[in-house]
Amino acid sequence: MSLRRQRITGYTTGAVFWPVTGNHKAVDYLIDEYWCPHEGETLLGGFANMGSSPEMLKIIEKNQHLLPNGGKLGRVALMDHPQIDHFLISCACDIIREYSPEFMLVHNGNIDDARHKYGVFNEEVLHGLDLVDLWIGQLMRALEDSGHLHDTDVIIVSDHGQMDLSRVIKPNVFFADAGLIQVDENGNLRDWTAFCCSNAMSAMVYLKDPANVQDYAKTYAVLQKMAAEGIYGFTTVYTKDETKAMGLDGDFSFVLETDGYTSFSTDWNRPAVRPFDRNDFRYGHATHGYLPEKGPQPTFMAVGPSFRENVWLDSAAMIDEAPTFAALLGVPLPAADGKVLQKLLR
């Protein structure tokens, strides 16, 4: 939901590792999701560059010992789970105790990381859930310490589920076979008519000249033939107009939807099937990016004075979450696509 609208409405706001909040002017207490330190950057300097105030830098410094290697920089070390999650939860608890923002977002990626690396259901994921339970308890104790436990709505959400993978396929290899991609003798990309970009268990196909009717028709025919054969990881090809009707728009011309066990690679060099790679979320042992009705569904749980007890929704649309939260705060969201989940509210 709109942090800017909450600022206008007069609420104080906080965000810890919530995606795309870097230097967000409407966040009063901000510790941004910090992935990629620049060369020569210090830990505190990096967070400051992403919008953390001096007050937040003190909290970061206090909890720095929880980071891998005490916060020595480097993407792999800094974003190592669950250490980074211990750090960010501790920071969030300190913000709650010291500043009590009226609206706060906290994001950890421990379960997401475990599923990418090991699959959807396994002992590693169960251990990750135990840690999530621990962190929720820490946040609740921080609310209790601040005196706001019983007047706070606590909501647990997820942006997606995941499905297990059996393989990772490279559609661009077959584009090259069809003459849609040209490579030199060393396998370097020389030119292209159509190019497939991975979104994990879906993929966007771009045309170099989207207005070229012949290129469009040739690419569509190649994709439909591949889908009909059923061996290339997808059995459905959506046009841009079809995906736009479902809420997905962009500069692409087509979208490929997974067969349910295949992820897609952007690479154009053989072999056409690539090995799993735990360092890239698209190619781990489980991932996301598919149509939302597939697979285990993302989480939504809520407790607090604004919510009715023992209410169960069989399903809901993720776009309904922000309007529901806005309704709790009395913040208008006139441009929102979703609706308020009234059944949940007192």
Predicted regions and their residues:
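Structural recognition of the beta-strand scaffold that forms the well-ordered cores
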Residues: 13-17, 103-107, 154-156, 204-206, ...
